[in-house]
Amino acid sequence: MPSTLQVLAKKVLALEHKENDHISREYYYHILKCCGLWWHEAPIILCFNGSKQMMIKTPIFEEGILLNTALMKAVQDNNYELIKLFTEWGANINYGLISINTEYTRDLCRKLGAKERLERHEVIQIMFKILDDTTSSNMILCHELFTNNPLLENVNMGQMRMIIHWRMKNLTDLLLNNNSISEILTKFWYGIAVKYNLKDAIQYFYQRFINFNEWRVTCALSFNNVNDLHKMYITERVHMNNDEMMNLACSIQDKNFSTIYYCFLLGANINQAMFISVLNYNIFNIFFCIDLGADAFKEGKALAKQKGYNEIVEILSLDIIYSPNTDFSSKIKPEHISFLLKNFYPKNLYIFDRCKPGLYYP
């Protein structure tokens, strides 16, 4: 093993990464290559994220990836020098067991301290920790490292459900209805990319999984990504009617103002939208529907009574105090919708708060 001084020197080189005026770029790069600080035909840059976690940057991973993720990729690529380097820098060599594909690499990991195999719960734990990093680079890497990985074939599906629900919420059951673990995982990474509008990752999955267009639209509606929804709609890749789209926008999570408004402008039934919001106990969505002109209070109240939602019954019983918000426009442009609804608070929720102070705390 290299000395502590050698490890420190490599870290300093990777952290500072400043070209010297007194030596040529070619010679500087030659030094980095000799030190093993080279990946994807370019220098390796070492940095730290806001949580003080070590990150690796290269031209392919411009946003940076966590050190343990970088180790997993190096193991998958059978890049022995980088496996040793990342382990020297503190990567957990057991993460490498996720992506081993040759006996030589397995032997190297053993020599570096890896255990013989991962338990099922450890595989899930590693996947959970890797998901902390919501970038395009990481979602693409998650797909490459986990989706067709035999270690995921026998995981505890109860634990898998918990991880999926953490990110997908009420889309979890729909996602788990798929037949294979590889399809579940592919849609999972794709869904996270849409949820956080990770454009490079969205494009990556779109190019490779054209048959998952409906899933992409479902995620855009459910997670309030009006930009991606509009992109799919204008290219005629949405094969749902307006009311089906609105149902998804209202049901998965609260405060989905942008996608609800988009569907409303397309002509979706706003009273039906309020009913779906009632059934899913999405209070902000209910008030937003009222702002947009929903007025089927009697029917909505009946639904709330059936479900035992007493607070919603109280809200809809005060229909006499509500009125549509006249500040909206009819422009179906994502940038306009995003600007209009930035920091938005439903007008009728203000009215309700004044009438019934303390009943509901948003």
From Swiss-Prot:
This is Protein MGF 360-19R. Pfam families: ASFV_360 (PF01671). It comes from the Viruses. One of its GO terms (biological process) is taxis. ANK repeats lie at residues 66-98. It comes from African swine fever virus (isolate Tick/South Africa/Pretoriuskop Pr4/1996) (ASFV). Belongs to the asfivirus MGF 360 family. InterPro entries: ASFV_MGF360. Plays a role in virus cell tropism, and may be required for efficient virus replication in macrophages. Keywords: ANK repeat.
